[in-house]
């Protein structure tokens, strides 16, 4: 986390310098690649560190005797504490192998089932889940899932998961990066579904839902690359962006800047 904080401090300093340049008569209107890269690294680091921290926390709970008991009443106090400690107001759940699950939001057994979630077979095969996008069955919020299996005697007996609100993650990034008005961040999964965005109304949309159809192929090409640059027009305004892929989440992170 120290590295991320350092990057944010550097980003703030560089962004302040960029703003000062913008007021000078000889200022350029193009994105500074160096400045944008620092901000991109800070943005990606903030999100990855937050989600990996959640994963670390639920793994610690998953190895407890309470979690291994597959008993909600025994496990509930630990999950309640975890839910209250999370900065992004998340729903913590405790799932059984048949997909039924308990939630801290519901304060017990829910009427929903997780077995139809695309990540659930992976979870039941003993693998962690990090970065899957869902509309939470517990809350209805646009969320990212972080989950881990609970193993006992070599078998998966339960799973602990957290559905984090993407709106609050975006606000968390906004608060900690303090970008200028003409610069913004966004990320998307492999299907070009927007996961976080400075403009919260654009989350859980595809680029073609925001602009014209020409954005589809442009972003599809970008999502095949590990990193790169992308220039496009949105609502008549020219946008320059740089991006890079997160191996941890299988998301692409973008920093974009609108030309004057």
Tell me the role of every PLM-derived stretch.
Residues 2-13:
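Bacterial N-terminal signal peptides
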Residues 24, 210-260:
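Extracellular/periplasmic juxtamembrane segments that couple receptor/chemosensory ectodomains to their
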Residues 25-27, 171-175, 259-260:
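Membrane-interface helix-start motif
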Residues 31, 35, 72-86, 159, ...:
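Solvent-exposed, extracytoplasmic
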Residues 49-59, 81-101, 128, 175-195, ...:
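Short N-terminal helix-loop-first-beta-strand/juxtamembrane motif that initiates sensory/input modules
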Residues 101-176, 223-238:
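Extracytoplasmic/periplasmic ligand-binding sensor regions of membrane-associated signaling proteins
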């Amino acid at each position: 986390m120290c590295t991320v904080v350092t990057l944010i401090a550097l980003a703030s300093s560089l962004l302040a310098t960029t703003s000062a340049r913008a007021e000078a008569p000889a200022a350029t209107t193009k994105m500074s690649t160096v400045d944008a890269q620092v901000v991109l690294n800070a943005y990606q680091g903030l999100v990855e560190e937050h989600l990996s921290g959640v994963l670390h926390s639920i793994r610690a709970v998953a190895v407890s005797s309470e979690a291994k008991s597959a008993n909600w009443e025994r496990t509930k106090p630990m999950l309640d504490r975890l839910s209250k400690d999370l900065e992004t107001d998340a729903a913590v759940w405790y799932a059984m192998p048949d997909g039924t699950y308990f939630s801290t939001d519901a304060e017990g057994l829910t009427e929903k089932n997780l077995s139809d979630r695309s990540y659930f077979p992976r979870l039941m095969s003993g693998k962690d889940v990090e970065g899957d996008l869902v509309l939470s069955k517990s809350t209805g919020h646009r969320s990212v899932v972080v989950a881990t299996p609970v193993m006992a005697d070599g078998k998966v007996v339960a799973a602990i998961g957290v559905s984090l609100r993407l709106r609050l993650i975006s606000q968390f990034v906004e608060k900690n990066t303090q970008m200028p008005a003409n610069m913004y961040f966004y990320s998307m999964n492999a299907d070009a579904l927007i996961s976080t965005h400075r403009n919260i109304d654009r989350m859980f949309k595809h680029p073609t839902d925001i602009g014209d159809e020409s954005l589809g192929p442009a972003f599809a090409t970008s999502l095949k690359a590990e990193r790169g640059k992308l220039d496009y027009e949105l609502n008549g305004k020219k946008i320059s962006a740089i991006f890079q892929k997160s191996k941890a989440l299988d998301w692409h992170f973008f920093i974009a800047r609108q030309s004057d």
